């Protein structure tokens, strides 16, 4: 389970450093924009953005849809305050809240979310809730992280536990779904809604970053507020982390630096007119 209060606190604390370290998230935002249909670009459509953060994707949406009314939601008040400084158009409403708890009153032509669905505790329920708020021919478009994310870290964490004889079920962070697992969750959520047929498309991509040191990688995670917000425990022994860092440096460093893999998933669910 994600501890939402802890998550909110971390995003609030690191809102001001988020943009400087969120390179992969920015890349994913552009990939989302590139997936959008050109049909709506000059129309007065309604858009709901979930997890707007500091407003990076919100700005891209404003440029792509000059006539759209945009509602952007984020859990963190610190993120919302920064987004308000970037996005000042009257047609954009910025709201602080948890989309899993908020009541959605209106319907939207587009519901879009970048690198946020991994923070949901009730993914099945939330996908169904959002899909119901789509207008006919509307789309739910989202990106999130897959189970190949931080594969180097997870491998070294497991090996470090073995070397030190630790047999706990702890992990260095939350677990992510594979493309197929998340696809099944979407279908299980939506198939019962027979009165609202859907079309689902999906894709995955690996993004690789390099850091000068393992510590620099850990710092980048902290600076975007995305350090472990699970309620599960993880090993914090100094001897364990020395072992972990040594394994990472020895096994995942090349001429470019320390390698970090992000597994990016993208889903587009369209409410068909059938």
Curated annotation (Swiss-Prot):
<comment type="function">
    <text>Converts the free carboxyl group of a malonyl-thioester to its methyl ester by transfer of a methyl group from S-adenosyl-L-methionine (SAM). It allows to synthesize pimeloyl-ACP via the fatty acid synthetic pathway.</text>
</comment>
<dbReference type="GO" id="GO:0009102">
    <property type="term" value="P:biotin biosynthetic process"/>
</dbReference>
<dbReference type="GO" id="GO:0102130">
    <property type="term" value="F:malonyl-CoA methyltransferase activity"/>
</dbReference>
<comment type="similarity">
    <text>Belongs to the methyltransferase superfamily.</text>
</comment>
<dbReference type="GO" id="GO:0010340">
    <property type="term" value="F:carboxyl-O-methyltransferase activity"/>
</dbReference>
<dbReference type="InterPro" id="IPR011814">
    <property type="entry name" value="BioC"/>
</dbReference>
<keyword id="KW-0489">Methyltransferase</keyword>
<keyword id="KW-0949">S-adenosyl-L-methionine</keyword>
<comment type="pathway">
    <text>Cofactor biosynthesis; biotin biosynthesis.</text>
</comment>
<dbReference type="InterPro" id="IPR041698">
    <property type="entry name" value="Methyltransf_25"/>
</dbReference>
<dbReference type="GO" id="GO:0032259">
    <property type="term" value="P:methylation"/>
</dbReference>
<keyword id="KW-0808">Transferase</keyword>
<keyword id="KW-0093">Biotin biosynthesis</keyword>
<dbReference type="Pfam" id="PF13649">
    <property type="entry name" value="Methyltransf_25"/>
</dbReference>
<protein>
    <recommendedName>
        <fullName>Malonyl-[acyl-carrier protein] O-methyltransferase</fullName>
        <ecNumber>2.1.1.197</ecNumber>
    </recommendedName>
</protein>
<dbReference type="InterPro" id="IPR029063">
    <property type="entry name" value="SAM-dependent_MTases_sf"/>
</dbReference>
